[in-house]
């Protein structure tokens, strides 16, 4: 389930390091986190939707890889991001 363009723009403006930033790990992780939360809410209602559950697991893995990359390259940005998003590690 893709995000609406206005939601994407809001996330980009909130987490971008420079203007028109779409590829930084912070923006990517924030967008994945939003998609994960949307899918989690969907799965609370539709418990037997296993195709969406697999998609959720893929998104979580992608976010985990981006967070690992960020923690290895710049630990301060990583800590700030997980605190801002409310993720636990």
From Swiss-Prot:
Domain of life of the organism encoding this protein: Bacteria
Keywords associated with the record: Ribonucleoprotein, Ribosomal protein, RNA-binding, rRNA-binding
Gene Ontology terms: biological process: translation
Record InterPro entries: Ribosomal_uS15 (IPR000589), Ribosomal_uS15_bac-type (IPR005290), uS15_NS1_RNA-bd_sf (IPR009068)
GO CC terms in record: cytosolic small ribosomal subunit
Pfam families according to UniProt: Ribosomal_S15 (PF00312)
GO MF entry, a single one: structural constituent of ribosome
PROSITE patterns: RIBOSOMAL_S15
Subunit structure: Part of the 30S ribosomal subunit. Forms a bridge to the 50S subunit in the 70S ribosome, contacting the 23S rRNA.
Family assignment from sequence similarity: Belongs to the universal ribosomal protein uS15 family.
Function: One of the primary rRNA binding proteins, it binds directly to 16S rRNA where it helps nucleate assembly of the platform of the 30S subunit by binding and bridging several RNA helices of the 16S rRNA. Forms an intersubunit bridge (bridge B4) with the 23S rRNA of the 50S subunit in the ribosome.
Protein name: Small ribosomal subunit protein uS15
Gene designation: rpsO
């Amino acid at each position: 389930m893709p995000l609406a363009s206005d939601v994407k723009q809001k996330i980009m403006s909130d987490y971008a390091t420079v203007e028109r930033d779409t590829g930084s790990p912070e923006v990517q992780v924030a967008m994945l986190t939003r998609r994960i939360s949307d899918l989690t809410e969907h799965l609370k209602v539709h418990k037997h939707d296993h195709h969406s559950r697999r998609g959720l697991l893929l998104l979580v893995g992608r976010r985990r890889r981006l967070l690992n990359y960020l923690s290895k390259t710049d630990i301060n940005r990583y800590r700030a991001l997980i605190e801002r998003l409310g993720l636990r590690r």
